[in-house]
From Swiss-Prot:
Region (Flexible loop): 100-110
Location in or out of the cell: Cytoplasm
GO MF, one annotated term: ATP binding
Reported function: Catalyzes the formation of S-adenosylmethionine (AdoMet) from methionine and ATP. The overall synthetic reaction is composed of two sequential steps, AdoMet formation and the subsequent tripolyphosphate hydrolysis which occurs prior to release of AdoMet from the enzyme.
CDD domains assigned: S-AdoMet_synt
Residues involved in ATP binding: H16, D174, A175, K176, R241, F242, D250, R256, K257, A273, K277
Lineage start: Bacteria, Bacillati, Bacillota, Bacilli, Lactobacillales
Name this protein carries in UniProt: S-adenosylmethionine synthase
Residues binding L-methionine, per UniProt: E57, Q100, D250, K281
Residues involved in Mg(2+) binding: D18
Reaction catalysed by this enzyme: L-methionine + ATP + H2O = S-adenosyl-L-methionine + phosphate + diphosphate
């Protein structure tokens, strides 16, 4: 864009109903992978007042106690009181798990390439579904993520920390944040224009107290002072009351916060959610690989921001297409970058799994506060270990 403009991203807390569902699905996935790294998992979760429904398809040699995983996850989030309308010890947990369809399994177990006689073992696994996936990176923050989303996630992490540490005693687990940043003509962040933050709370506390505490202890503690000015607008619990929340206020479902999970609306999204899926599902693994590519391209100095698209056919190992968009900021042509990516990154499902070591139980930690740009946990797709290889290829 050639003029100043506003852009907004949002995040939600770990106690948001959709995020409860994501965390339960990924907690089950992790437990299965701990016991059987080759588990095929597609677990969905739905939560509502007093009820958790876990359903989907699993093929595994492992046994896991789903009831216990569900209750432990809810307890860790902070739903431990019947007054919340949903709590770890008293909610009902219903499971309805089937095996993976043999029609899907035959294409994943033996890809089209293998059936046609290819000998490369990394050709063996076919994509678990057709689909298109995107990865993105920008140099506007040290995390290589949009500032709007980085700040939104940090606000949610901070409010959860204050709640769990008992610093603000009236906080309940459900919360949302939204940050609007003003950018200059060159897409550089200038200032924070608007902060929206809604948090669930106990009934006794006054709105004035909430506004004071959230502004001082959350917003001003998280957002650097140079981004805030006397024109910055604050909307803190703008409905005036947020006592009923969590699954009692809204039903939650796995996979409904895909923009919070990714790039806050700054990049395209192929539509496939991540949580509850093992790495043979390219919705997840190829999105991670695309982020890995984009971040290494930007870190290597070949673009100020980059978006990667990859697409797959079910049962076929090789991607059907790779696209790179550097938004006019590239120091190499997009054709050159794609050629380098094909040399440096193996985008077959088995290649991605090996490259990023994705058979490990590392997923529950991604199910709240974003899958990308994380500095609090070590995620392989955030590593910058391909920068030198890209420089070697591209010169």
């Amino acid at each position: 864009m050639a003029e100043r403009h506003l852009f907004t991203s949002e995040s939600v807390s770990e106690g948001h109903p959709d995020k409860i569902a994501d965390q339960i699905s990924d907690a089950i996935l992790d437990e299965l992978l701990k016991k059987d790294p080759d588990s095929r998992v597609a677990v969905e979760t739905s939560v509502t007042t007093g009820l958790v429904l876990v359903f989907g398809e699993v093929s595994t040699k492992a046994y896991v106690n789903i009831q216990q995983i569900v209750r432990d996850t809810i307890r860790k989030i902070g739903y431990t009181d019947g007054k919340y309308g949903f709590d770890a010890d008293n909610c009902a947990v219903i499971t309805a798990i089937d095996e993976q369809s043999p029609d899907i399994a035959q294409g994943v177990d033996d890809s089209l390439e293998t059936r046609e006689g290819e000998a490369d073992p990394l050709d063996k696994i076919g994509a678990g579904d057709q689909g298109l996936m995107f990865g993105y990176a920008t140099d506007e923050t040290p995390e290589y993520m949009p500032l709007t989303l980085v700040l939104s996630h940090k606000l949610m992490r901070k409010i959860a920390q204050l709640r769990k540490d008992g610093v603000i005693s009236y906080l309940r687990p459900d919360a949302k944040a939204e940050v609007t940043v003003e950018y200059d003509e060159n897409d550089k962040p200038l200032r924070v224009d608007t902060v929206v933050l809604s948090t669930q709370h106990d009934p006794e506390v006054s709105l004035d107290q909430i506004k004071k505490d959230i502004k001082e202890q959350v917003i001003e503690a998280v957002i650097p002072a140079e981004y805030l000015d006397d024109q910055t607008k604050y909307f803190i619990n703008p409905t005036g009351r947020f006592v009923i929340g969590g699954p009692q206020g809204d039903a939650g479902l796995t996979g409904r916060k895909i923009i919070v999970d990714t790039y806050g609306g700054a990049a395209h999204h192929g539509g496939g959610a991540f949580s509850g899926k093992d790495a043979t599902k390219v919705d997840r693994s190829a999105s991670y690989a695309a982020r890995y590519i984009a971040k290494n391209i930007v870190a290597a100095g070949y673009a100020k921001k980059a978006e990667i698209q990859v697409a797959y056919a079910i049962g076929v190992a090789e991607p059907v297409s790779i696209m790179i968009n550097t938004y006019g900021t590239g120091t190499r042509s997009e054709e050159e970058l794609i050629a380098a990516v094909r040399k440096a990154f193996d985008l077959r499902p088995a290649g991605i799994i090996e490259m990023l070591d994705l058979k490990r139980p590392i997923y529950k930690q991604t199910a709240a506060y974003g899958h990308f740009g994380r500095t609090d946990v070590d995620l392989p797709w955030e590593h910058l270990d391909k920068v030198d290889e890209l420089k070697e290829i591209l010169g």
